[in-house]
Amino acid sequence: MKIKKAFITGITGQDGSYLAEFLLEKGYEVHGLIRRSSTFNTSRIDHIYQDPHTPNCRLFLHYGDLTDGTRLTNLMHEIKPIEVYNLAAQSHVAVSFLIPQYSAQVDAVGTLTLLESIRSAKIECKFYQAGTSEMYGSTLPPQNETSSFRPQSPYAVAKLMAFWSTVNYREAYGMHATNGILFNHESPRRGETFVTRKITRAVSRIALGGIEKLYLGNLEAIRDWGYAKEYVESMWQMLQQDKSDDYVIATGKGATVREFARVAFEHVGLNYEDFVVIDERYVRPTEVEALVGDASKAEKILGWKAKTDWITLAKLMVDADIEKVKSQPK
């Protein structure tokens, strides 16, 4: 039987690492796009890395970048994947205000470049685009596939172009191209500058006597937080459908940053009010007040439903960060 090949951009990130694990377990040969850096940035996938010289190796990493169309086209010719997952992005909302042009180049134009590389290579494959709930911006919750997009950051604007580029290639060229509109999804592998991980890392260090304060911005922002490990399964399920479409992936439950902090601190027997300090530097020029998704379409068509609620997730992340701090040399 011919082995299935998948190509993942952003394989070294939170979602990419979980997706790579998931696809390897399903018997895929997984190819990942990585950027060259002066230090290794593969910590999230080191545990599944395989020496390409070993027999039956099924994980391969390729240097490249979403801004290099020639390289992407050559990789499509060489690998001939049946599934392409575009997870790579400058995905930090606050940072996108500082580097808007770069965010647009990677998140918007980069997606278009990858789509065109697939088309130019003339390969038959299914394409998944990582959308984001940030595209809804100021639209009131609950947000679903028919809700209006009102982006409030350069990141969201760039992702919206990527969304419509995916729709355009689906309609113009008959490409099996799907958008997954994922609401906030977290895990112990979440980047350390994102608010949930920033909270759980601080809780672990405060609990173990490392630091004294946690500086945050808008505590009243409401988000729908789910478990990233579960969310990547929906990406694969979308590409198993005969017809490509767009799907919201969410838990349907919202909580404020304040509530997340409270639960995280209470998990180690502390009161968040004793440690959290508001720093106006972390307040964004345009705030998105509330994002809570309606994933009923995904449940009906894909059979996907979130299993882990945000409270369980917060505790899971605190526990993981405590173990990480304990394992570090003193």
Predicted regions and their residues:
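N-terminal Rossmann-like NAD(P)+-binding domain of SDR-like oxidoreductases, especially those catalyzing
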Residues: M1-H185, L239, T308, M317-E323, ...
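C-terminal substrate-binding subdomain of Rossmann-fold SDR/epimerase-dehydratase oxidoreductases
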Residues: E25, G32, S37-F40, F60, ...
